[in-house]
């Protein structure tokens, strides 16, 4: 807490290109109003440097941030975006940028055009350092974006993305506050959807059966045209899905996390799910992340369950963040989700045998390349190739068997070519019961992608042989 302020809140965490974490947050009710401050850590979050002021004004709120990981001219730049109330011109969106890893910030700049009710901005960098900010216009219930091609110095005309139907607050039968906090993500990679921009929001279906769901709009032409789909299209229960947050990973895959109630027949308990698109936002696959549903009313703050979801992704992992109340208290939860390569089972029985079906989904940037599904009895130290790609498998007997007998009756479709989205299906089939002496052995499998030298290796997935 900075001297002279009463409390702080709304933290946004961004990682610089060198891995330095920066927290950008609000400081409330000090002299001059509310401030936007940035804090850096040079020891992986153990200690934090003194705060750096990015802005000080009467009523700042809801700050979000992003870093430019593209190969564009502003590589490494950080941008913070927030809304400001009571400006005399409605509620507006402001940004400030840093070109030195959060040590200093530019003078804040208003970027929205209309004197409207602009609120809750989100920010993302796309290909070639294109900077995108989205927000909700709560006066007209519109989703809006704007973008800058020069590192935030100048901005274009506001772009309309879509209308949305305001979700009731609270949702009927619930107690927690709803708010129009949406998300933007941009493809900063060099893949087939480079430059694409995605906006995710929740909206209300006002006719029976009434419920909230998540939509995502995509543009592949710099915002000139947008097409949107329902993200949670596989849900046939008419349950509520709210509070989306989106990120594009290094393989060009779009990942969106959100709260979801489809597993509760009463449409009440909350789970966290992740939806992924490897085709530029045209279709999504959905995965449950949290272990159990939770009752927001049983926690200490039934009204607030956290306005923000969060999600980030590396080349190998997706990391959703959310408020979780399964303990009876509100906690910040995170999971490491391996959705590039996984098995539908974690065990196979010696008594009956069986099949472990593998899903490969490594993203459109690797689409059309060759792949091997390989196995090993251990993951350490693994194999590191000359170009730095690390395969987390050892060169042992199982490794050699999976190579020699690829595409056999036992190792099915374990060598081939990925589809355009970077996907394939493979399996390990025991062909019936196997020796009980093998029970207790862990088998590890990983996918190696070639172009033709090793280009990428997935995290391993484990299948344990049991009696």
Positions of the model-derived regions?
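Extracellular, repeat-based ectodomains that mediate carbohydrate processing or recognition
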Residues: 1-340
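Residue-level hotspots within well-ordered secondary structure
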Residues: 340-467
């Amino acid at each position: 807490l900075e001297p002279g302020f009463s409390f702080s809140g709304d933290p946004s965490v961004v990682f610089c290109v060198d891995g330095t974490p920066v927290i950008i947050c609000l400081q409330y009710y000090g002299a001059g109003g509310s401030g936007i401050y940035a804090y850096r850590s040079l020891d992986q979050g153990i200690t934090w440097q003194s705060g750096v002021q990015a802005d000080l004004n009467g009523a700042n709120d809801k700050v979000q941030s992003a870093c430019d990981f593209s190969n564009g001219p502003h590589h490494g730049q950080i941008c913070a975006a927030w809304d400001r109330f009571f400006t005399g011109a409605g509620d507006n969106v402001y940004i400030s940028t840093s070109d030195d890893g959060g040590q200093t910030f530019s003078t804040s700049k208003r970027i929205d055009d209309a004197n409207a009710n602009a609120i809750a901005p989100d920010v993302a960098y796309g290909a070639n350092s294109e900077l995108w900010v989205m927000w909700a216009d709560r006066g007209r219930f519109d989703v809006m974006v704007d973008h800058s091609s020069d590192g935030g110095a100048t901005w274009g005309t506001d772009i309309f993305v879509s209308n949305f139907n305001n979700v009731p607050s609270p949702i009927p039968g619930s107690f927690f506050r709803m708010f129009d906090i949406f998300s933007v993500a941009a493809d900063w990679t060099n893949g087939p959807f480079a430059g694409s921009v995605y906006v995710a929001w929740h909206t209300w279906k006002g006719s029976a059966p009434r419920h909230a769901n998540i939509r995502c709009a995509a543009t592949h032409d710099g915002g000139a045209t947008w097409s949107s789909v329902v993200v949670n299209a596989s849900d046939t229960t008419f349950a509520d899905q709210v509070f989306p947050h989106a990120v594009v990973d290094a393989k060009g895959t779009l990942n969106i996390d959100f709260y979801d109630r489809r597993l509760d027949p009463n449409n009440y308990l909350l789970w966290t799910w992740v939806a992924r698109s490897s085709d530029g936002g045209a279709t999504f696959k959905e995965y449950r992340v949290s272990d159990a549903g939770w009752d927001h009313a049983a926690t200490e703050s039934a009204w607030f369950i956290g306005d923000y979801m969060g999600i980030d992704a590396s080349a190998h992992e997706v990391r959703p963040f959310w408020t979780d109340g399964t303990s009876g208290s509100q906690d910040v939860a995170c999971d490491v989700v391996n959705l590039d390569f996984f098995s539908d089972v974690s065990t196979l029985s010696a008594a009956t045998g069986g099949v472990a079906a593998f899903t490969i989904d490594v993203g459109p940037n690797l689409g059309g390349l060759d792949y091997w599904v390989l196995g090993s009895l251990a993951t350490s130290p693994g194999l590191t190739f000359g170009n730095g790609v690390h395969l987390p498998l050892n060169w042992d007997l199982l490794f050699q068997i999976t190579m020699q007998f690829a595409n056999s009756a036992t190792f099915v479709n374990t060598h081939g070519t990925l589809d355009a989205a970077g996907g394939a299906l493979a399996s390990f089939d025991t062909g019936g019961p196997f020796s009980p002496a093998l029970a207790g052995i862990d088998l590890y499998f990983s996918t190696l992608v070639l172009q033709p030298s090793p280009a990428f290796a997935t995290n391993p997935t484990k299948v344990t042989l049991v009696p």
